[in-house]
Amino acid sequence: MSAFIVSQPALERNARILREVADAAGCRVVLALKGFSTWPCFEDLRPLLDGCCASGLWEALLARRRFGKHVLTYSPAYAPEEIAELAEISDHLD
């Protein structure tokens, strides 16, 4: 069994910096679930980030159900049986 410790103050401080950069640049900042998918932290990140970037069906489902904002999904290939569901839950599908 593994355990991870996340510094909430550091996470929020970094997310606020990203929010400031996004506002100044006029762009969106999304959470890459491949790099950080610790969904119990999503509640603190949700107000500061614009959504999530997923790399497949399971990450897109996590983003839609737990983060609840813009879901961008990208993969070099998709399983044919997953495309309909991905199109339904993703705001952008590449």
Question: Where would I find each of the regions flagged by the language model?
Answer:
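Generic N-terminal amphipathic, Lys/Arg-enriched alpha-helix
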Residues: 1-6
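A non-catalytic, amphipathic alpha-helix used as a structural packing/dimerization or gating element
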Residues: 9-17
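Active-site-proximal beta-alpha core segment in soluble small-molecule metabolic enzymes
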Residues: 27-94
